[in-house]
C-alpha cells in the first residue's frame, strides 16, 4: 500500500488514491461545517494558497453565501496577481499521427475516419506566417505521439522553423510545447531549443480510470506519464503546465489530484506549475461527450476555476476555444489569465482552412471568433489583451518568475509590457474599430502606472511603436 508523500518522486505516492478518497470523505463530512469553511476562506485571503484537502471542502460546500465569498475572493486574487491582463495565444497542430488508443481523442490509432496529416517545414512556415498576420506572438504547439512520424527531431525542427520566421513586423516570441511524456534527455533538447512552458495534461489522476481510458500505446503507462513534469524539470525546463480533461472522471477527484500535483512540484522543485489548464471534453470526429458520465455543468466549472485560483494564486490559468464566449466571459473574472483566439484545431488549418472531408481537427471549436473580435471583446469588458513574452526572454522563469509573482512585483513589468505589445497589435493588425477602442484603453491605462519613471518610458515606447515603426520594447 502506497503512502501519501508529496516529496516522493513516485506517482502513486505524490498522487495518492487513498489520500484523495480521504480528502473527499473529509470534505463530505465538513461541507456544512461553516466554521471550518470560514477558516479556510480566511486562510485563502492571505493569498498564499490552500491545500487539496481544504480546497475539497470549499468545492463540496453548497452554502450560497460562502460560494459568493469564494467567487469574490477569486476575483480579488486574480486582480492582485494578474491585474486586468489577459495573455493571448494560439495552438498550432503539426501532426495528428498517433500510436495511442485514448478513447476520448479522435487522434486515437484505431480511428480510420480522420484524415492523417503531418506538416512539412515549408507548411509550418506558412502556418506561422498566417498566425503572424493575425497578430499572434505566442504559440502552443501540439502533435500526436508517434515515434516514427513525430520523433523529437521533427518537433525540434518545427520549433526552429517557427522562431526563424519574421513576416513583415511579425515574430513568434514564445513557443510552448504540448507533446507526449518523454525522457530527461529529450526535455534537455527542448530546453536547448528555447521553448517556453512544457505543457502536459494528466487527463485524469485516477489510475484505474486512466488505464481504462488509455488501453493501448505508450500513454497507457500511468506512472511514466504522471512523473513527466519531474523529468522535465530535471532536464532543465523551468516552467511546466498541468491540467486535467474534465468530464473523464469525477470532478472532485480530479481537483484534489490536480492540486496535489501542484503541491508536489512546489515541494520537490521549489516551483509550482507555471500554468494550469481546465479543458472539458468536447465533441470531435468519432467522439461523443455524452459517452462519458462525468461531464460538468457551467456553474460547477466556474466554481472549479474559482477554487483553483485561490488554491494556487500564482499560477497562470488557461482556457481555450473549446469553451463558448459566454463561458469564457464568466471564468475570465474568476481566475483565467490566458485565452486563445482565432484558433484552428486542425493540422494546417491557418494557412488554408480545411474542408469537411479533410477533417483533421482534435476537437470542435465553440468560440469561432477571429483574434481581432476576441481582442475587441476583451477590451470592451475592461481587460488588457497582452501579447507579452518578456519574462521568458528576460530570464524571469521558474523560481525567479514565481518570486516576483508571489510578491506582486511582477505587475511593475507586466502592465507596461502588456500595453506596449497591445499597441504593436493595434498598429500592425487590428481593424479600425478595434484600434480605436484599444488606443483609448492604452491612454487610460498608462496613467495607472504608479512608477513615474516607468510610466514615462512606456509612453515614449508607445509613441515610437505608433509613429516610428519601432517594435519589441520590454521592461
Predicted segments, located by residue:
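Canonical Radical SAM [4Fe-4S] cluster-binding loop centered on the CxxxCxxC motif
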Residues: 82-123
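Radical SAM enzyme core and accessory elements
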Residues: 1-39, 43, 329-334, 343-475
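An N-cap/entry alpha-helix motif that binds or orients negatively charged groups
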Residues: 38, 42, 46-86
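Short glycine-enriched, charge-decorated loop/helix-capping segments at active-site entrances
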Residues: 213-219, 290-294, 360
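Core AdoMet radical
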Residues: 109-126, 130-233, 239-248, 270-277, ...
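Generic structural signal for well-ordered alpha-helices
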Residues: 90, 128, 156-163, 187, ...
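Conserved C-terminal portion of the radical SAM core fold
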Residues: 143, 197, 223-287, 297-326, ...
Amino acid at each position: 500500500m502506497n503512502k501519501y508523500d508529496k516529496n516522493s518522486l513516485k506517482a502513486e505516492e505524490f498522487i495518492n488514491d487513498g489520500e484523495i478518497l480521504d480528502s473527499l470523505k473529509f470534505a463530505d463530512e465538513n461541507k456544512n461545517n461553516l466554521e471550518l469553511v470560514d477558516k479556510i476562506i480566511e486562510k485563502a485571503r492571505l493569498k498564499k494558497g490552500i491545500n487539496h484537502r481544504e480546497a475539497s471542502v470549499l468545492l463540496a460546500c453548497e452554502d450560497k453565501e460562502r460560494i459568493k465569498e469564494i467567487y469574490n475572493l477569486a476575483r480579488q486574487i486574480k486582480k492582485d496577481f494578474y491585474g486586468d491582463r489577459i495573455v493571448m495565444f494560439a495552438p498550432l497542430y503539426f501532426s495528428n499521427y498517433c500510436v495511442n488508443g485514448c478513447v476520448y481523442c479522435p487522434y486515437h490509432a484505431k480511428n480510420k475516419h480522420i484524415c492523417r496529416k503531418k506538416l512539412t517545414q515549408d507548411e509550418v512556415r506558412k502556418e506561422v506566417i498566417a498566425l503572424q498576420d493575425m497578430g499572434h506572438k505566442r504559440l502552443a504547439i501540439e502533435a500526436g505521439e508517434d515515434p516514427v512520424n513525430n520523433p523529437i527531431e521533427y518537433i525540434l525542427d518545427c520549433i526552429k522553423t517557427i522562431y526563424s520566421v519574421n513576416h513583415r513586423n511579425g515574430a513568434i516570441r514564445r513557443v510552448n510545447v504540448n507533446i507526449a511524456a518523454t525522457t530527461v534527455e529529450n526535455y534537455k533538447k527542448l530546453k536547448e531549443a528555447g521553448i517556453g512552458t512544457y505543457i502536459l495534461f494528466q487527463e485524469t489522476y485516477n489510475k484505474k480510470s486512466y488505464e481504462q481510458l488509455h488501453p493501448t500505446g505508450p500513454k497507457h503507462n500511468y506512472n511514466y506519464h504522471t512523473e513527466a513534469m519531474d523529468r522535465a524539470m530535471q532536464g532543465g525546463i523551468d516552467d511546466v503546465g498541468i491540467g486535467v480533461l474534465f468530464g473523464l472522471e469525477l470532478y472532485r477527484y480530479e481537483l484534489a489530484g490536480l492540486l496535489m500535483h501542484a503541491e508536489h512540484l512546489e515541494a520537490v522543485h521549489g516551483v509550482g506549475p507555471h500554468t494550469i489548464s481546465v479543458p472539458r471534453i468536447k465533441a470531435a470526429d468519432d467522439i461523443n461527450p455524452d459517452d462519458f458520465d462525468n461531464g460538468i455543468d457551467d456553474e460547477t466549472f466556474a466554481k472549479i476555476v474559482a477554487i483553483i485560483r485561490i488554491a494556487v494564486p500564482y499560477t497562470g490559468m488557461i482556457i481555450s476555444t473549446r469553451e463558448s464566449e459566454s463561458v469564457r466571459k464568466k471564468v475570465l473574472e474568476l481566475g483565467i489569465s490566458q485565452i486563445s483566439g482565432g484558433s484552428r484545431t486542425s493540422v494546417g488549418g491557418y494557412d488554408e482552412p480545411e474542408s469537411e472531408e479533410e477533417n483533421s481537427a482534435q476537437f470542435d471549436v465553440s468560440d469561432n471568433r477571429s483574434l481581432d473580435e476576441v481582442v475587441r471583446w476583451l477590451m470592451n469588458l475592461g481587460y488588457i489583451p497582452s501579447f507579452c513574452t518578456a519574462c521568458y526572454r528576460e530570464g524571469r522563469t521558474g523560481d525567479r518568475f514565481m518570486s516576483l509573482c508571489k510578491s506582486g512585483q511582477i505587475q511593475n513589468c507586466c502592465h507596461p509590457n502588456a500595453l506596449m505589445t497591445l499597441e504593436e497589435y493595434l498598429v500592425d493588425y487590428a481593424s479600425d474599430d478595434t484600434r480605436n477602442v484599444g488606443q483609448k484603453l492604452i491612454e487610460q491605462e498608462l496613467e495607472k502606472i504608479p512608477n513615474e519613471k516607468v510610466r514615462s518610458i512606456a509612453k515614449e515606447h508607445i509613441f515610437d511603436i505608433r509613429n516610428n515603426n519601432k517594435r519589441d520594447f520590454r521592461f
